C-alpha cells in the first residue's frame, strides 16, 4: 500500500530533532511524544477499538508521575524497580519514574523470584512497582491493565519535574550469574541513532499496511532487544504499538491478524514455534496437497531471491491459505534475536513471505548488528550482519570484542563489584564469532560453553542447534553430559506414545544430518521433566547441568524408549477408544457397553445426521483436533480411533 505521508522527509525531521537534542532521556521523551496526533497504541475496550495518540499519552505519563508522588513514591534519584509485563502502563510508568527523579530498574519477570529479590537487595531498591502480588513491603502493587486507567486520567499533570538520566537492565541469568547494566541517556541516544544506518540498508523496515506501521509488543521491554529494537527504534518515528492480552499462541496469532500488525520482533523460540506449527499443518494434509504446499514454498523462496519485492508480493498470493492460518498478509518485517536459530526456521518463515532477519546483541552492549540483505538466501545463512554505526567489531582468539558509544556505562556484578565501561576500549563479549570474506559476522556460541572432541576439536553446541528443528518434542538441547556430547529431549507425558514414530524418525534424521555435517553425537537421552523454566526463551545449559546434579531432571537412555512406548500404547489404545465411546454414548444416550468398536453410527447404533454433526464437534473438542475427510467419512469408533492416532503423529 502507498503511504499517505512523505516518509523520507518525516524521517529526516526526526533525526534532525535528535541531532539538535542534548542526548538526555528527557529530550528523548520530548522528541518521541512531540508528534501531534500520531497513534501510540490501540486496544479493545468493551469491543470498541480505542486509539491513544502520542499527545494524549504524554499527558497520561505526566499524570502517572503525579500518581506515583501521591502514593508516596519519592525516589530522590535512587533506584525504582519496575516488575511488570508489557502494556501501555508499563511505558507510562517507565517515563514517569524518570520524570520524578527515579532510576528505573527494568526487572525481568522471567527470572526466578529469588534472583529478583537478590537484585532488589543488592541495589537497595526501596520502591518496586509490580503487577505481581508478593509479601514484601517494598512492593507497590499496580493494576497493570492495558488501557488508560480512570484513577490516573482524573489527576492533574505533575507540576515539578525532576528528571533522572539513567535506566537499568538486568541480564537474563542463563549462566546463573546475573549482571546489572546501567545505561545513561547518551548511550540510549547513540543506540537510537543506529536506526539511520538500518533505514539506509533496508527499505522493507519502512513498509506500511493500509497506511499504518504497527509493532507487536511481544518482546518484553525489560529486555534490551524489546526496549531498543521494538520500543525506541519505532516510537521515535511515532509508530503504533499493539500489546498482547497474554502470550498464548492463539492470542498472538489473533492479535496480529485483528490489528494488522506489520512488524514482529521475537526470540528464536517464537519463530521455531511458528515453523513447527507450519510444518505440522502441512504434514497433516493429504499427500497431494502436502507436496503442492512444499512446492509452492520452494518456488516462493526461489522467486524472492531473484526479485525480492516482487517475489514477496507473489508469495502472499500463492501462499495465502498458509499465511491466513498464521499472521495474515499484513506482516512486512521480522527480526529474531537472543540466541541461535535453526536454518530450517529461517528458510520456512522467509519462504512463505515473512522477511525474517537475524540480529545480535547483549544486555551489556545493546543491539549491535543485524543481517539486513533483501534476498532470503543470505538471511538463511544465520549471519547476524555487520556492526551497526555506533559500534565496531574485532575478533580476537575467536571471541567477539565490541567497542562503541552505545554500550552501557556501568556493570554491577552479582557480588557487588562495579565496572565502568570505557567506550574507547574493547569489551569482551564472551561470544565466539567468525567473519566471512564479505565482512558478515556469525555467532557460533559461548566461550564457556564448549565441548572438546577426541581429536581436540572445539565444538559449540549452539552451532549444532542451528542445523536442527525438532517438531515432535517440547524442548531439546545439545550439551556435554558425562563428558560426552549428548542430545537431551524433553517429551510430553500425555502424547509421547502416539508421537513415538515421529520422535524416533526425527532423532534418527537429526543424528544422520549432524554426522554429515561432521558432528558425532555420542548419546541421546529423554526426560519428562522440565529442562528449562517454563518462561525461559531458551534452554540454559548451565541451569540444566545444575538441575541434573540436583536430581530435578532424570534422564533415560533413548535406547529404552521403544519398549516404554509399547507398554504405554497398550494403555493408550484402551484409553482413547474409551474416550471415543464415551462421546458416542453421550450423544446417542446409550450405555457405553452397548457400543462396539466396529458398530456403525447410523446403521447399527441408530444415529441421525444431526447427531453426527454433534458427534464431530464433540470429538474435535475432546481431542483438540480438526476432523476432515479425504475420500470417505467415518462412522465407527475404530475409524475415528485410526484417524485420531494418525493426526496425533
Annotate each predicted stretch with a short phrase.
Residues 262-265, 277-378, 475:
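Gly/Ser/Thr-rich phosphate-binding loop
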Residues 192-214, 221-316, 320:
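Conserved AMP-binding/adenylation subdomain of ANL enzymes
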Residues 40-74, 78-87, 94-95, 114-117, ...:
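Conserved AMP-binding/adenylate-forming core of the ANL superfamily
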Residues 51-55, 166-193:
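Conserved AMP-binding A3 loop
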Residues 37-39, 151-170, 176-177, 203-214:
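Conserved pre-ATP/AMP-binding loop-to-beta segment of ANL
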Residues 60-66, 181-207:
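Conserved structural elements of the adenylate-forming
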Residues 508-568, 616:
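Conserved C-terminal "lid"/linker of ANL adenylate-forming enzymes
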Residues 387, 391-394, 399-454, 458:
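Conserved ATP-binding/catalytic segment of the ANL
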Amino acid at each position: 500500500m502507498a503511504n499517505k505521508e512523505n516518509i523520507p522527509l518525516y524521517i529526516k525531521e526526526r533525526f534532525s530533532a535528535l541531532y539538535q537534542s542534548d542526548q538526555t532521556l528527557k529530550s528523548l521523551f520530548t522528541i518521541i511524544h512531540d508528534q501531534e496526533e500520531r497513534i501510540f497504541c490501540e486496544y479493545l475496550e468493551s469491543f470498541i477499538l480505542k486509539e491513544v495518540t502520542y499527545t494524549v499519552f504524554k499527558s497520561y505519563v505526566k499524570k502517572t508521575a503525579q500518581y506515583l508522588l501521591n502514593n508516596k513514591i519519592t525516589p530522590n534519584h535512587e533506584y525504582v524497580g519496575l516488575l511488570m509485563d508489557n502494556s501501555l502502563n508499563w511505558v507510562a510508568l517507565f517515563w514517569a519514574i524518570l520524570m520524578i527523579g527515579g532510576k528505573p530498574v527494568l526487572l525481568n519477570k522471567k527470572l526466578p523470584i529469588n534472583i529478583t529479590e537478590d537484585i532488589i537487595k543488592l541495589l537497595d531498591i526501596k520502591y518496586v512497582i509490580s503487577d505481581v502480588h508478593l509479601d514484601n513491603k517494598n512492593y507497590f502493587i499496580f493494576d497493570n491493565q492495558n488501557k488508560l486507567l480512570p484513577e490516573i486520567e482524573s489527576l492533574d499533570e505533575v507540576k515539578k519535574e525532576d528528571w533522572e538520566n539513567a535506566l537499568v537492565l538486568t541480564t537474563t541469568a542463563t549462566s546463573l550469574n546475573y549482571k546489572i547494566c546501567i545505561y545513561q541517556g547518551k548511550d540510549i541516544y547513540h543506540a537510537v541513532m543506529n536506526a539511520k544506518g538500518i533505514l539506509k540498508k533496508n527499505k522493507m523496515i519502512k513498509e506500511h499496511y493500509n497506511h499504518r506501521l504497527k509493532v507487536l509488543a511481544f518482546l518484553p521491554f525489560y529486555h534490551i532487544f524489546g526496549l531498543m529494537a521494538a520500543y525506541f527504534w519505532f516510537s521515535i518515528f511515532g509508530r503504533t504499538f499493539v500489546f498482547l492480552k497474554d502470550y498464548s499462541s492463539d492470542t498472538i496469532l489473533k492479535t496480529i491478524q485483528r490489528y494488522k500488525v506489520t512488524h514482529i520482533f521475537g526470540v528464536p523460540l517464537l519463530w521455531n514455534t511458528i515453523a513447527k506449527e507450519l510444518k505440522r499443518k502441512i504434514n497433516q494434509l493429504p499427500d497431494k496437497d502436502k507436496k503442492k504446499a512444499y512446492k509452492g514454498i520452494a518456488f516462493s523462496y526461489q522467486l524472492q531471491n531473484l526479485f525480492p519485492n516482487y517475489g514477496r508480493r507473489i508469495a502472499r498470493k500463492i501462499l495465502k491459505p498458509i499465511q491466513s492460518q498464521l499472521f495474515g498478509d499484513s506482516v512486512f518485517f521480522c527480526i529474531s534475536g537472543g540466541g541461535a536459530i535453526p536454518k530450517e526456521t529461517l528458510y520456512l518463515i522467509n519462504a512463505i513471505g515473512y522477511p525474517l532477519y537475524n540480529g545480535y546483541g547483549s544486555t551489556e552492549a545493546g543491539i549491535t548488528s543485524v543481517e539486513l540483505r533483501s534476498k532470503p538466501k543470505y538471511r538463511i545463512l544465520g549471519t547476524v550482519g555487520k556492526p551497526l554505526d555506533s559500534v565496531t567489531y574485532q575478533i580476537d582468539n575467536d571471541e567477539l570484542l565490541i567497542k562503541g558509544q552505545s554500550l552501557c556505562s556501568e556493570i554491577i556484578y552479582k557480588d557487588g563489584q562495579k565496572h565502568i565501561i570505557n567506550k574507547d576500549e574493547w569489551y569482551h563479549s564472551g561470544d565466539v564469532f567468525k567473519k566471512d570474506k564479505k565482512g558478515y559476522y556469525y555467532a557460533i556460541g559461548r566461550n564457556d560453553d564448549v565441548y572438546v572432541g577426541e581429536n581436540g576439536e572445539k565444538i559449540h553446541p549452539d552451532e549444532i542447534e542451528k542445523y536442527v528443528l525438532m517438531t515432535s518434542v517440547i524442548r531439546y538441547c545439545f550439551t556435554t553430559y558425562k563428558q560426552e556430547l549428548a542430545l537431551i529431549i524433553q517429551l510430553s507425558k500425555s502424547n509421547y506414545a502416539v508421537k513415538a514414530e515421529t520422535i524416533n524418525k526425527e532423532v534418527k534424521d537429526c543424528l544422520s544430518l549432524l554426522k554429515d555435517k561432521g558432528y558425532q553425537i555420542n548419546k541421546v537421552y529423554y526426560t519428562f521433566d522440565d529442562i528449562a523454566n517454563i518462561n525461559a526463551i531458551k534452554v540454559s545449559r548451565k541451569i540444566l547441568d545444575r538441575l541434573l546434579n540436583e536430581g530435578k531432571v532424570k534422564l533415560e537412555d533413548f535406547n529404552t524408549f521403544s519398549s516404554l512406548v509399547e507398554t504405554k500404547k497398550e494403555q493408550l489404545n484402551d484409553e482413547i477408544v474409551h474416550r471415543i465411546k464415551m462421546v458416542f454414548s453421550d450423544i446417542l444416550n446409550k450405555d457405553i457397553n452397548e457400543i462396539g468398536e466396529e458398530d456403525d453410527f447410523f446403521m447399527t447404533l441408530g444415529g441421525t445426521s444431526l447427531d453426527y454433526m454433534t458427534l464431530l464437534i464433540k470429538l474435535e473438542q475432546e481431542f483438540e483436533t480438526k476432523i476432515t475427510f479425504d475420500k470417505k467419512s467415518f462412522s465407527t469408533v475404530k475409524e475415528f480411533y485410526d484417524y485420531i492416532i494418525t493426526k496425533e503423529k
